[in-house]
Amino acid sequence: MKRITSLLAVLCLTALLAACAGKGAGQLPPPESPAAAERSEQLWQALVRQSARHDAAPYRLGLSLRFGSQGDTRRVTALFWGNDDSHLRLDVMAGVGAVIANIVEADARFLIYSPRENVAYFHEGSTKPLLKVGVPVPLALADLSALLNGRFLRAFGEGHTPVAASSPDTAAFALEKRLGGVLTLDAQGLPVRWTENGDKGWRMELLYDEQGLPRRLNLTHANGQKAIVLVKQRDTVQQPFTEEQLGLALPEDTPLLPLSRYRAPADGKVAP
């Protein structure tokens, strides 16, 4: 009987040690545990510090944008500039010097002008106007500006609740305002993935340059739409842009239509 009791004790001790070993590196504690809460808060504070590194300032970015679905994609280039996130210009080009769209966003007002068709569309509100013109980027220009320039809290908001992460080196948060969804941070506190709420929403992955600024956004949607936004060039801007440089003067005979009147061309290509 003593031998059986001793054997059972050894087996129980072995099982206990194995269980403890299984909780070592490589496994995440439950989100509600003190260790998980501490790790999440540390990475969120790292995000706060990352965002604080980049004040709003005049900028100009050269972008490349590829978008579409499997077997049907387009590539355009763009110049994106502004003094901060409140008054922005985006010129979209299909070739060298061939501007196909001039876009202005200021104080939640959005204006897009097609020089080829001499027609302009306007929109006012907090929705995502780029989606309405067939460009699969689920962000307002102000959010895109903040994101590409490293002002992550401006883009994603400050309200957050820790949720289970997919790896020990990351932390995930349900966002309460702004874009909503779930944001994943890496070990440096940089956003590496954002997933929209719902099973039919957007997913965005972020890659960075040596300065810790986004250089590539990979966007996918459950319906098959995809977009890749590449930052090809960051220009140093010494002086703030003037109102004329940020504004958009339309020809006098330009029809001005609500963005709800926008219709994609019959050939299925995004326009303007």
Label every PLM stretch briefly:
Residues 1-20:
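Sec-dependent bacterial lipoprotein signal peptides
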Residues 72-76, 101-105, 200, 226-227:
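Amphipathic hydrophobic-ligand
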Residues 128-158, 173-179:
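Extracytoplasmic segments of membrane-associated envelope/inner-membrane machinery
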